[in-house]
Amino acid sequence: MIGRITGTLAAKQPPQVLVDVNGVCYEIDVPMSTFYNLPGIGEKVALLTHLAIREDAHLLYGFGSEVERAAFRELLKVSGIGAKTALSVLSGLSVNDLSAAIAAQEIGRIVKVPGIGKKTAERLLLELKGKPVFAGALASVPSAGASDDVRQALLALGYNERETAATVRELPAGLAVGEAIRQALRALSRA
């Protein structure tokens, strides 16, 4: 199995990316949450992966965090949910939002995801209730490289290394990069 790919981002076009690993380009489908947090083309990227082997293809799916990959794998276990639908769910809802919807049995949040109807949403809520990924067991795992991205953004905005490092350490784990930057800026403006 291919568990992680590290290389240079060669191209990106939603929902796919091409990662060049020593001259071999891997085509990887990613949820939009991962896509929006990717570096620029030509920069180094690392993605956790899930390899799906079908009769007619070997497909790679990439994720920015272990939590996201674990959620994808749990979604695949739900009857009637394939890889494309699982990616659609993770593109439409963050793992934390999906976890909250499952815990509260909020069918309305799930049916807003393109490709998910009422029956599929009901099945999803029923089959995923109580799963550790969605019960919060993995919710504290930070995104791969998220804290470094936040630190780099704050340094680019003119904050010094000491205050940046202290602020990043205080951020809650598991935040998306954009939200982490917003919270860090709020914390720095209060200091």
From Swiss-Prot:
Q: What is this protein called?
A: Holliday junction branch migration complex subunit RuvA
Where is the major localization of this protein?
cytoplasm
Location of region: Flexible linker: 138-141
Which BP terms in the Gene Ontology apply to this protein?
Answer: DNA recombination; DNA repair
Q: Which cellular component terms (GO) are annotated to the entry?
A: cytoplasm; Holliday junction helicase complex; Holliday junction resolvase complex
Chain segments carrying region Domain III: 142-191
Subunit note: Homotetramer. Forms an RuvA(8)-RuvB(12)-Holliday junction (HJ) complex. HJ DNA is sandwiched between 2 RuvA tetramers; dsDNA enters through RuvA and exits via RuvB. An RuvB hexamer assembles on each DNA strand where it exits the tetramer. Each RuvB hexamer is contacted by two RuvA subunits (via domain III) on 2 adjacent RuvB subunits; this complex drives branch migration. In the full resolvosome a probable DNA-RuvA(4)-RuvB(12)-RuvC(2) complex forms which resolves the HJ.
The organism that produces this protein has a lineage beginning with: Bacteria, Pseudomonadati, Pseudomonadota, Betaproteobacteria, Nitrosomonadales
- Give any GO molecular function from the UniProt entry: four-way junction DNA binding
